[in-house]
Amino acid sequence: MIIIKFNDDITHTYNSFEEILKLENYNDIILMNCNNNNLSNLPKLPKSLKFLYCSYNKLSSFPKLPNSLKHLYCYHNDLSSLPKLPKSLKLLYCHNNYLSSLPELPNLLKILYCNGNYLSSLPELPNSLKHLYCYHNDLSS
């Protein structure tokens, strides 16, 4: 099941991923929840998207993330890398993937869950960061 929320606060539910592909021209989508769907890829994301929930899939890569994105939940996938993160991002949940590195972290980031990956180092952490979870990685002190 796919859940889409528009600026008008109306939530729309779709039973198949194919239906989402028809939505790429909408510019007022603010939330997309496609958790638990065995997806291997995502469509082009709308520029207005603020909240993306795509955990428990089989994603190995991402399309370009929109500049408006504030929350990204992409844990329990097959990701080996993340794209450039938008400056607006405040929450990043990317745990339990195959990440060996993280991109530059945005200055507004407050919460980072990157545990259960293969990280050998972390990028510079922003001063705004309040919660960091990075256990079960290949980090050395």
Where are these regions (language model features)?
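LRR N-terminal entry segment and analogous cap-like coil->beta motifs
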Residues: 5-55
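Canonical leucine-rich repeat
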Residues: 23, 42-45, 62-65, 82-85, ...
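Concave beta-strand-loop units of leucine-rich repeat
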Residues: 31-38, 48, 53-58, 68, ...
